[in-house]
Amino acid sequence: FAVVYLAYSMVWELGIYASGFAMDGVVELLLAQFGAVLALFATYFSLKKVRTLPSSGLGFTIRGRGKDVIGGILVATLLYSFGFGISCFAGWIQVESFQWPWKSILTTWLLFFLVAVYEETLLRGIVLGKLLDSGMSKLVALVLSSLLFSVLHLLNPHFSCLPFANLFLAGVMLGASYVYTRNLWFPISLHWFWNWLQGPVLGYGVSGIKIDEPALTIRFSGPEMLSGSSFGFEGTLLCTILMIIVTGVIIGRCRQIYR
């Protein structure tokens, strides 16, 4: 299973790289991602019958999890409010114009929801879930699944050491709650709005991928590790700091609730 989906994910990354997020390619990407989600679920339920996947299930129980969805959205919003605000104040980015291309905004909103469902189901629901079910410690399982999450982005444009480290930290941040709750709604909503706010709304690249019609057009100043001009906000030291803080808060909160 892991080999098949590692190969599939690499093909998916190449497809994004080839077509970009231009509007004439977004619909195709949306359909392709929808197909990927369907294939993932079909494979999971087929292989679950032979006990090769997490016995605990994927983590899509929705009852009582509305606060997790809201929480993930709020965390992403607050993180980018601080990150974008600090970057503007420091002069690393400047807003040049604003528009609201509703078709692009809506389509990418749906696209990044499917991306979040796919990646969180695969990396957290299946990979991390299987590692935890095997008796592996929470820390080791979280580290291994986060490394895989970062490796799956190796083919993205402008990938380098800092984006690798930050995507690893993003994997830890997204998986931190799952090791306690075994539920995906918080990481899905956080991942969803993380990507959507970063690219289509604020005008950064998303993991190195340029967004064609963002709401904000921004100009970058200073070195890449401060401005995120090539890879996006995920390629900045400020992102590193904020993710470490957010991850610490998530783990601390989960330890309080799920003792």
Task: For every predicted segment, state its role.
Residues 1-54, 199-259:
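N-terminal, membrane-interfacial amphipathic/helix-forming hydrophobic leader that caps
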Residues 163-224:
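Functionally important transmembrane alpha-helices
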Residues 118-144, 176-183:
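Membrane-interface helix/loop boundary segments of multi-pass membrane proteins
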Residues 30, 69-74, 105-106, 139-144, ...:
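Hydrophobic alpha-helical transmembrane segments
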Residues 7-30, 53-121, 128-134:
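Juxtamembrane helix-loop-helix connectors linking adjacent transmembrane helices
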Residues 2-9, 80-84, 146-154, 193-201:
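Aromatic-anchored segments of alpha-helical transmembrane domains
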Residues 80-83, 112, 116, 138-154, ...:
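Small-polar-interrupted transmembrane alpha-helices in polytopic inner-membrane proteins
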Residues 30-42, 102-110, 118, 122, ...:
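Membrane-embedded alpha-helical segments of multi-pass membrane proteins
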